[in-house]
Amino acid sequence: MAKLTKRMKAIKAGVDSTKAYEINEAIAVLKQFATAKFDESVDVAVNLGIDPRKSDQNVRGATVLPNGTGRSVRVAVFTQGANADAAKEAGADLVGMEDLAEQIKKGEMNFDVVIASPDAMRVVGQLGQVLGPRGLMPNPKVGTVTPNVADAVKNAKSGQVRYRNDKNGIIHTTIGKASFSAEALTQNLQALLAALVKAKPTTAKGIFIKKVSISTTMGAGVAVDQNSL
């Protein structure tokens, strides 16, 4: 087992793993230990009251955080005609059809999000083995297959996060940067949780949001008292 660094020992000593912190206190703890030489991301893990083995209880979707994520996002769009012009005007970094597909087949993957209009899926479908494993395959459930590509581009650029539970029924995503104010991070977390509640499967019973923890890229997890949200 790898030895803990002095920094990680200090972080672990400063976080009470048995306690659920009030949100402002939780954020203060994160900021206290966010001492890396870069602006660390603030990530969230949400334990859901679902049975991930049942397909009708899996949760997947996307929402735009009111204060963004602090990340610069490059967007590729598969579309044509007037939609291509609209996508470019909305800020898309790459727009095309077969030409864009050829770039991707050659390994040119300089983007973070892929959006497609429905008529372009015949082209995108050929890229499943490349885009799928990277979590980049467009999907209507998260709004990346849409006739309104311009709005999808704007959402991606303005702080949209996509979420999907893992095999343990936990959602992992980001809600901003350590440099964000406590208010901005709280608003982003509230927006994410509201989106998750709306996405609750009808077959899920009992408490839906069971636990919420936040952490920075290089820090320990801090449990959040949901009553403080």
Curated annotation (Swiss-Prot):
Keyword entries, A-Z: Repressor, Ribonucleoprotein, Ribosomal protein, RNA-binding, rRNA-binding, Translation regulation, tRNA-binding
InterPro entries, sorted: Ribosom_uL1_bac-type (IPR005878), Ribosomal_uL1 (IPR002143), Ribosomal_uL1-like (IPR023674), Ribosomal_uL1/biogenesis (IPR028364), Ribosomal_uL1_3-a/b-sand (IPR016095), Ribosomal_uL1_CS (IPR023673)
GO cellular component: cytosolic large ribosomal subunit
GO MF terms, alphabetically ordered: rRNA binding; structural constituent of ribosome; tRNA binding
Signal peptide boundaries: none
One GO term (biological process): translation
Subunit and interaction comment: Part of the 50S ribosomal subunit.
Family listed: Belongs to the universal ribosomal protein uL1 family.
Listed PANTHER family: 54S RIBOSOMAL PROTEIN L1, MITOCHONDRIAL, LARGE RIBOSOMAL SUBUNIT PROTEIN UL1M
Protein role: Binds directly to 23S rRNA. The L1 stalk is quite mobile in the ribosome, and is involved in E site tRNA release. Protein L1 is also a translational repressor protein, it controls the translation of the L11 operon by binding to its mRNA.
Protein's name according to its UniProt entry: Large ribosomal subunit protein uL1
